[in-house]
Amino acid sequence: MGRKWNNIKDKKASKDANTSRIYAKFGREIYVAAKQGEPDPESNQALRVVLERAKTYNVPRTIIDRAVEKAKGGSEENYDELRYEGFGPNGAMVIVDTLTNNVNRTAADVRAAFSKNSGNMGVNGSVAYMFDATAVIGLEGKTSDEVLEILMEADVDARDILEEEDAVIVYAEPDQFHAVQSALKDAGVEEFTVAELTMLAQNDVTLPEDAQAQFEKMVDALEDLEDVQQVYHNVDLGE
């Protein structure tokens, strides 16, 4: 399965503390999902996924409503969903997902973030085959056995169910995201600590200390780009 979710979460915590950055990225993602389909999450699964994710980051209702209303209002602002793949120091593998209204700008910015930090862009497919698209659902107040029983009774498949720190984390196929959540909600779960569609590395690598410092600098540079929504990688950043 690669890194446990909490290992990823802990390293993201300091970056995610930048709430204005997080809210801006969610605002854009909600707008795009609402514009591409119905602005109603009941009939728009992509929008429902984004809104469930937003809940776990405590995105204010005002941010959500503003993005949905913008989509309803027929805004002509369009974004392309683009994925870039590349390598960091010591051949570390990186995937960068973006939403952009200026492809040339985004490509140049992403390329610069790689090249200025001992990395380089790769071609499409150069690293993605080493990652698995995964739904990650986290909750508290249940044991892994209880969650397994709930999902089995609801006839919902999961790849893995692990107890990580004080939470239970369910790893499933992306198309099982809503099914997992629905089964748990029906069983009385009201809040989720994690609700993500992510790319998990099949195998992790450990970098020498100097290379890891350079790698973390590169990831920070990528995540700070306005058009970047998510950065995935295969580096075990340790404690």
UniProtKB/Swiss-Prot annotation:
GO terms for biological process: regulation of DNA-templated transcription. One of its GO terms (molecular function) is DNA binding. GO terms for cellular component: cytosol. Keywords: Cytoplasm, DNA-binding, Transcription, Transcription regulation. Its main location: cytoplasm. It is found in: Cytoplasm. Belongs to the TACO1 family. YeeN subfamily. This is Probable transcriptional regulatory protein BA_0541/GBAA_0541/BAS0510. The lineage of its organism: Bacteria, Bacillati, Bacillota, Bacilli, Bacillales.
